[in-house]
A protein has these predicted regions:
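Conserved long hydrophobic alpha-helices within structured protein cores
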Residues: 78-92, 178-188, 221-226
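Alpha-helical scaffolds that organize eukaryotic protein assemblies
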Residues: 148-152, 157, 161, 167-168, ...
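The N-terminal extracellular segments of secreted preproproteins, especially immediately downstream
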Residues: 28, 118, 172, 178-179, ...
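N-terminal adaptor-interaction module of cullin-RING ubiquitin ligase components
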Residues: 1-128, 133-141, 159-160, 164
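C-terminal capping region of solenoid repeat domains
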Residues: 97-105, 109, 117-118, 142-143, ...
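Conserved beta-strand positions
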Residues: 45, 63-66, 90, 127, ...
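Solvent-exposed loop/turn tips at the surfaces of repeat/solenoid architectures
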Residues: 48, 66-69, 90-93, 130, ...
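Structural register of leucine-rich repeats
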Residues: 39-41, 62, 76, 85-89, ...
Length: 359
């Protein structure tokens, strides 16, 4: 029997999906080890310290993930070794205290610059909690012309300078700026006046407390925005900004959680103008009342509504909305309300949509 060529072996490898099986075979077949490395498209790195030892086996990776400690030198290695990477996922759940001093001062800006320069096919980049600053973001946008998703959540060094660069992106669809608390209305204006306004479908600016009504009014220029998260943007957001957001006709998903100066005025505007809206989260909006909730009785597309910690919304308002709506499928309420709503009423509501309770 003739020895299998690399092409034939590559076809066989594509049929072996279990990672344990792949690892077992690679331990007894050097050719398999080599070819499997060349055909691997995705890798998740648990210990970046040994990255230099094994990464050269995988020159054709298109997706790279590392949620643990990583430094600029590691990213430079990735950029040099794997130029075909399209998806870079460095999201982490916490900041690491044991960074090198140079990395602690600059975040991963140097490494991200190397990635942006070396991996020109980047489409999706996730950098949550990685301390990226303006230099890293500008590098990504200068080199990454195909970028569609960018997660900068909790990168609290980001300022309006980064948003100016993002505004020039021509293919960006998803942008997460959660808790980037240095950004202001000026940054949102640059986003709304740039090329991004014609492509962005999902924008998260939750916990950005320097945003005001003026910044939200700029978002009206985003012609295809479908998802908007404004949770905990602070008291500077009022009904003026809420009404402006309501005028975005493409909105399908809207989170207004804990905007304490949003009232029924905003809800009435949303019910009237946001005809494509399917999900609305009003958690902690203390000023809204049953009048605002009842405005959605005739809304034709609303499917999910969250009314947690809405102290001025009562049983009769919820019942009227659910029984009158033709589209509502899910409603979430405070658990404290449960004792005040008769069992018969709860059962009646549950006939038309799923009733969920939170503590």
């Amino acid at each position: 029997m003739e020895k299998l060529g690399d092409d034939e072996l590559g076809l066989i490898i594509n049929w072996v999906h279990d990672h344990n099986d792949r690892r077992s075979i690679s331990q007894v077949c050097k050719q398999w080890l080599r070819v499997e490395g060349q055909t691997r498209l995705y890798i998740r790195v648990l210990e970046a310290e040994v990255l230099h030892n094994f990464l050269p086996r995988f020159p054709n990776l298109v997706a790279f993930q590392a949620s643990g400690l990583i430094c600029n030198a590691h990213l430079e290695c990735v950029a040099q070794t794997c130029p075909k990477i399209e998806v870079l996922n460095l999201n982490t759940r916490k900041m690491h205290d044991d960074l090198d001093e140079s990395d602690e001062l600059s975040g991963l800006n140097g490494g991200i610059h190397a990635i942006a320069n070396g991996c020109r096919e980047l489409r999706k980049v996730y950098l949550r909690r990685r301390g990226i600053g303006n230099f890293g973001v500008v590098s990504l946008l200068n080199f990454g012309k195909n970028l569609t998703e960018l997660d900068l959540g909790r990168c609290n060094r980001i300022t309006d300078q980064a948003l100016e660069a993002i505004g020039y992106a021509t293919s960006l669809c998803v942008l997460n700026l959660r808790c980037c608390w240095l950004i202001t209305d000026s940054g949102l204006a640059m986003l709304a006046n740039g090329s991004t306004a014609r492509t962005l479908k999902k924008l998260i600016i939750a916990e950005c407390e320097r945003i005001t009504d003026y910044g939200l009014s700029c978002l009206q220029q985003m012609c295809c925005l479908e998802e908007l998260n404004l949770a905990e943007c602070g008291p500077a957001v009022t009904d003026i900004g809420g009404v402006a957001v309501a005028s975005i006709p493409t909105l399908k998903w809207l989170n207004l959680s804990w905007l304490i100066n949003i009232s029924d005025v905003t809800l009435t505007a949303i019910a009237e103008h946001s005809q494509k809206l399917t999900v609305l989260d009003l958690t902690g909006c203390e000023l809204i009342t049953g009048e605002g909730v009842r405005a959605f009785v005739d809304h034709e597309s609303l499917e999910e509504l969250v009314l947690v910690s809405c102290v001025n919304v009562f049983q009769s308002d919820v019942e009227l909305l659910v029984l009158g709506s033709q589209s509502l499928k899910y409603i979430k309420l405070d658990k404290r309300l449960r004792m005040w709503i008769p069992i018969a009423t709860q059962e009646n509501i549950s006939r038309f949509c799923r009733l969920d309770w939170t503590s």
